[in-house]
């Protein structure tokens, strides 16, 4: 996804807050997002109906470069996922006006954010702070060929060693 004025992945159409969400099991993996004005990832599940178990969201090995730097913006807006894993993601110059990840979770939800790199990027905002697990990094990324939109970390770089960011196919 690159050079977009709107949102890239938007599953936030629920309006009545009764737990009817747009996708049940979502995997976003090995994707790059470059120069997005809107939200790269926006997922919303409202309501408190415990009979609806979901959505299940996994976001891993993604790179966000110069995304959603508007005031009070966020790179990922995740409201209500009951099972969430965000891991091995690279945030480069993104979410500076607000947050890299804005997560609204309940204490009983199974949520985990781990092994991510935040270089010149906004903070993580969570409701309970239980989601952020393990080490977060602040490493200046070096990419294979950014001019050609190849955001795979340079071979032998710290990000490659930590398995953060895009993986070479």
What feature does the model see in each segment?
Residues 1-169:
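Extracellular beta-rich repeat passengers
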């Amino acid at each position: 996804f690159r050079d977009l004025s709107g949102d890239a992945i938007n599953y936030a159409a629920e309006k009545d807050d009764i737990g009817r969400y747009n996708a049940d099991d979502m995997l976003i993996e090995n994707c790059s997002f470059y120069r997005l004005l809107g939200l790269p990832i926006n997922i919303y599940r409202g309501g408190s109906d415990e009979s609806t178990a979901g959505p299940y969201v996994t976001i891993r090995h993604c790179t966000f470069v110069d995304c959603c730097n508007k005031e009070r913006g966020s790179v990922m807006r995740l409201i209500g996922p009951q099972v969430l894993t965000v891991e091995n993601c690279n945030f480069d110059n993104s979410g500076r006006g607000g947050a890299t990840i804005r997560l609204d979770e309940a204490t009983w939800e199974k949520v985990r954010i781990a092994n991510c790199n935040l270089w010149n990027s906004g903070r993580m905002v969570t409701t309970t702070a239980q989601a952020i697990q393990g080490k977060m990094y602040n490493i200046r990324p070096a990419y294979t060929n950014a001019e050609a939109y190849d955001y795979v970390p340079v071979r032998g770089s710290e990000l490659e060693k930590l398995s953060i960011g895009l993986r070479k196919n």
